[in-house]
């Protein structure tokens, strides 16, 4: 197994419902270590740049509106095969299709308000971590 870093974002719906601690518990119980974490409000510009790969998709504007509707918690996670492990503990994008015991099944409200975003590949993880964090903010 390989030690990896991955990016995670707790979304506004979970923040508004005071679920940060619960989300972190899922992540830590899965064996992931939170090595950086900060809360902020994303600007529309930041959100549009972050989700740039979806710019041509019909849901892009609503995604930017949603992700800027409240605070988010940005995280760097570390662990063995962290990217796959994080994707597994998050569950399917649609909470209705996610397995029981996953963050999205247990805490998500809809496809958009599904409580959490996580990197889907090593390239995405690198880009997303570097988008929000300086190396000095990541505690080993």
From Swiss-Prot:
Cofactor requirements of the protein = Mg(2+)
- EC numbers listed for it are 2.7.4.6
So what does this thing catalyse? a 2'-deoxyribonucleoside 5'-diphosphate + ATP = a 2'-deoxyribonucleoside 5'-triphosphate + ADP; a ribonucleoside 5'-diphosphate + ATP = a ribonucleoside 5'-triphosphate + ADP
Localization per record: Cytoplasm
Enzyme's top EC category: transferase
Which residues are ATP-binding?
A: 11, 59, 87, 93, 104, 114
Active site residues of this protein: 117
The highest taxon in the source lineage is Bacteria
Q: Which of UniProt's keywords are assigned here? A: ATP-binding, Cytoplasm, Kinase, Magnesium, Metal-binding, Nucleotide metabolism, Nucleotide-binding, Phosphoprotein, Transferase
Can you quote a single GO CC term?
cytoplasm
Q: Which family does it belong to?
A: Belongs to the NDK family.
Assembly, per entry: Homotetramer.
The record describes the protein's role as:
Major role in the synthesis of nucleoside triphosphates other than ATP. The ATP gamma phosphate is transferred to the NDP beta phosphate via a ping-pong mechanism, using a phosphorylated active-site intermediate.
Write down what this protein is called: Nucleoside diphosphate kinase
Taxonomy, top ranks, is:
Bacteria, Pseudomonadati, Pseudomonadota, Alphaproteobacteria, Rickettsiales
**Chain's gene name:** ndk
């Amino acid at each position: 197994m390989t030690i990896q870093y991955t990016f995670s974002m707790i979304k506004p719906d979970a923040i508004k419902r005071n679920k940060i601690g619960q989300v972190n518990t899922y992540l830590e119980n899965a064996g992931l270590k939170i090595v950086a974490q900060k809360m902020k409000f994303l600007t529309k510009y930041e959100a549009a740049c972050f989700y740039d790969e979806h710019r041509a998709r019909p849901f892009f504007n609503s995604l930017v509106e949603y992700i800027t509707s409240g605070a988010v918690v940005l995280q760097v996670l570390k662990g063995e095969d962290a990217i796959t492990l994080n994707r597994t503990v998050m569950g399917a994008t649609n909470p209705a299709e996610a397995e029981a015991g996953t963050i999205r099944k247990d805490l998500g409200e809809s496809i958009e308000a599904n409580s959490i975003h996580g990197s889907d590949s090593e390239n995405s993880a690198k880009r997303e971590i570097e988008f929000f964090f300086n190396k000095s903010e990541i505690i080993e």
